[in-house]
């Protein structure tokens, strides 16, 4: 929605009037410029949305003893009438609300894609949706979208080239070997620092590579790796051998990784080091070069947690055959892109990760997958459209008033607590003042104009 400046409007009218008065009587009137085409307003068809799940006393099962099995007494009839859908691994009220939200988003995306006059965020959403839903083009392209990346991997013949590839992929958010992000400094929360933590495994955690009771999953993963490589054109026998290589490669990473139990200890994520100290720990991987490639200033300090993992990666850069690195990197490049490639890649990705690992019976419909990706990459852009139809400004204003009243009441209670000292009250009020309500959506949206 645009707003007009009254002073600017008045000035414009005055200029128009002056120009008109100065015209010669015989001047022909100038044709008005055609109005710019406007995007259509977004609408919502409630009739196409899933019905909300509403509690009814008839849902209670009098045939079940509430004191014996309260869950069956309250939820048994509902669960019997609402089996888990084939494209889900769980089902409940939150999932139903999620389905409704997706249905709303679908309507918005379809409208944005169909509107040739859409601009800004609406155009971004419409283009994203149209691209993701163009199955014919996706099938025709096959693996072509990632061929340049695969060609780059095929050219990795030494330690320096492999380290350079890792740096390059990290710079575009696709680090194949470790996780890298910025978070608050554990010891000084007023500033953020970089954290480089373990990664690189295709299975959920290190136990999948060693525990006997998970051997069937490891075998299925090996078969999945071979199949993915086959789909890229690798001969079956070569794909099977490369799959063994990838498993051996990841097993070595797993042995140097912390367990899920260890990862619960937040302190293990904090290992502040200087660039010089980090480079000394990983002689085959320069952190100085890494930060340069990320287009950020060299930090005085960053956190290098799980040092044994990073040291092992450095050793592998030096002692592992580049062919093994190529097999590992090639598989993960294709596997990571598989959900967005042609159907044979999508199906193979689903068969292992969703069906084998998590028991999901059916793949989600394409429109749901496209929305899932859209929300992951540009969720705030979709949110900007979503609130126009699902949470308008007057709803936000009412909630802000409600929360404001609660804050005022809380402050009053603190000030009138008889058992709290004046000094403690001052500290409590200081903490109260730091509370920033965030309701519905931000007052200032992220600027997506650079993508338009």
Question: What does each model-found stretch correspond to?
Answer:
Residues 1-10:
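Bacterial N-terminal signal peptides that target proteins for export
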Residues 22-32:
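Bacterial lipoprotein signal-peptidase II cleavage site
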Residues 44-51, 65-137:
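Active-site-surrounding "flap" and adjacent substrate/cofactor-binding loops of secreted or lumenal enzymes
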Residues 111-401, 405:
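Noncatalytic, helix-rich "gating/capping" subdomain that lines the substrate-entry/channel surface
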Residues 233, 254, 397-452:
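Contiguous, non-catalytic segments that form substrate-binding/exosite surfaces or channel walls
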């Amino acid at each position: 929605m645009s707003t007009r400046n009254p002073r600017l409007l008045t000035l414009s009218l005055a200029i128009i009037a002056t120009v008109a008065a100065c015209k010669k009587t015989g001047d022909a009137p100038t044709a008005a410029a055609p109005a710019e085409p406007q995007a259509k307003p977004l609408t919502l068809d409630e009739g196409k949305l899933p019905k909300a799940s509403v509690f009814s006393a008839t849902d209670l099962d009098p045939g079940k003893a509430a004191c014996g099995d309260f869950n069956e007494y309250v939820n048994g009839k509902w669960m019997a009438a609402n089996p888990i859908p084939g494209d889900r691994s769980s089902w409940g009220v939150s999932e139903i609300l999620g389905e409704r939200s997706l249905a709303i988003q679908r309507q918005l995306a379809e409208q944005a894609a169909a509107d040739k006059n859409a601009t800004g965020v609406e155009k971004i959403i419409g283009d994203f949706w149209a691209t993701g839903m163009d199955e014919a083009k996706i099938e025709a392209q096959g693996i072509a979208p990632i061929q340049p990346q695969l060609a780059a991997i095929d050219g990795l013949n030494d330690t320096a080239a492999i380290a350079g590839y890792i740096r390059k992929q990290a710079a575009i958010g696709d680090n194949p070997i470790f996780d890298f992000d910025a978070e608050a400094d554990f010891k000084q929360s007023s500033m953020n620092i970089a954290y480089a933590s373990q990664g690189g495994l295709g299975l959920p955690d290190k136990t999948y590579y060693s525990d006997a009771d998970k051997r069937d999953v490891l075998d299925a993963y090996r078969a999945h790796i071979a199949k993915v490589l086959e789909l890229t054109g690798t001969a079956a026998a070569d794909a099977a051998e490369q799959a063994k290589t990838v498993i051996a490669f990841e097993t070595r990473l797993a042995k140097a990784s912390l367990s899920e139990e260890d990862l619960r200890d937040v302190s293990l994520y904090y290992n502040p080091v200087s660039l010089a100290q980090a480079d000394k720990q990983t002689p085959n991987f320069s952190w100085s070069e890494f930060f340069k490639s990320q287009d950020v200033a060299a930090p005085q300090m960053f956190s290098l947690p799980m040092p044994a993992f990073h040291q092992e990666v450095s050793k592998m850069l030096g002692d592992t055959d580049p062919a093994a690195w190529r097999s590992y990197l090639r598989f993960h490049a294709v596997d990571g892109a598989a959900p967005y490639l042609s159907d044979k890649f999508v199906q193979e990705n689903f068969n292992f990760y969703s069906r084998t690992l998590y028991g999901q019976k059916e793949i989600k419909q394409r429109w749901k997958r496209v929305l899932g990706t859209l929300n992951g990459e540009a969720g705030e852009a979709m949110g900007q459209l979503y609130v126009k139809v699902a949470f308008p400004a007057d709803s936000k204003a009412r909630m802000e008033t409600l929360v404001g009243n609660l804050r005022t009441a809380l402050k009053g209670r603190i000030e009138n607590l008889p058992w709290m000292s004046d000094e403690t009250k001052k500290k409590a009020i200081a903490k109260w003042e730091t509370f920033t309500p965030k309701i519905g959506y931000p007052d200032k949206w992220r600027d997506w104009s650079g993508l338009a």
